[in-house]
Amino acid sequence: MDGDNQSENSQFLLLGISESPEQQQILFWMFLSMYLVTVLGNVLIILAISSDSHLHTPMYFFLANLSFTDLFFVTNTIPKMLVNFQSQNKAISYAGCLTQLYFLVSLVTLDNLILAVMAYDRYVAICCPLHYVTAMSPGLCVLLLSLCWGLSVLYGLLLTFLLTRVTFCGPREIHYLFCDMYILLWLACSNTHIIHTALIATGCFIFLTLLGFMTTSYVRIVRTILQMPSASKKYKTFSTCASHLGVVSLFYGTLAMVYLQPLHTYSMKDSVATVMYAVLTPMMNPFIYSLRNKDMHGAPGRVLWRPFQRP
């Protein structure tokens, strides 16, 4: 069966990272808790930014979209994971697996692009403050976000289309949490050299280019901060970047743990690293921004308690 006639009835088995019923119950409650915390945290960030006029700035516009992306990202994978923990039927259809993979690739790429745009926003705000209003106009912000969405959608479609050219035969058992590109290539019985080369080439180009852009931006930001005469001003300026820098470090650190390795060395032990980038990073982002950013201090809490306040 080739990529053209993978039947709609074909399916994969998402066996997860443990087949022990006791461990699956523990994993169920752990992932359910993490999912609820992630949803609550990111929804509160979005509501706080949309309801507070003081936060209607380019930086928080992109932060709200980053939270939306993280919310969509965990919803793409965790609900199916939770169902599998509680069910004997762990099957996922071929189309369902490709759909999950498409959104996974697109949303990881979108996260990366938004983080790069946020780095540019901080660079303009700190290194070119007199031009900030014109350089980060509302129209340009919408255009940049549209480009981020467009590129991520196209990249997801490209890799998903290439995967439809791959043949799967024999046991389609995925000892993993969700349909991941590396795992599916690992299960393939046809030649995956072309798609693997395309995955490495495009992935390195996109992610390393944007990482290089962010690194260059922060080098210039740090240089500008060091030239400031006042220590208090240096601290205040750097604190506006600390949250973003923390999120970037967490995002790239966990992503590198999973994907910066040859395909033949990829094994199920990488599930721990996958949990970190697929679940822990979206969960931690709201806390990082809320705790490290002065403008966001208490903002999610105010949204949460607003219905209980007297008019």
UniProtKB/Swiss-Prot annotation:
Gene3D superfamilies from the UniProt entry: Rhodopsin 7-helix transmembrane proteins (1.20.1070.10)
Membrane topology classification: Multi-pass membrane protein
Membrane topology, Cytoplasmic segments: 50-57, 121-140, 221-237, 292-311
Disulfide linkage: 97-189
GO MF, any single term: olfactory receptor activity
TM regions (residue ranges): 26-49, 58-79, 101-120, 141-158, 197-220, 238-260, 272-291
One GO cellular component, as annotated: plasma membrane
Keyword Hydrolase: no
GO biological process terms on file: G protein-coupled receptor signaling pathway; sensory perception of chemical stimulus; signal transduction
Ranges facing Extracellular side: 1-25, 80-100, 159-196, 261-271
Record's protein name: Olfactory receptor 1D4
Organism listed in the record: Homo sapiens (Human)
Gene that this polypeptide is encoded by: OR1D4
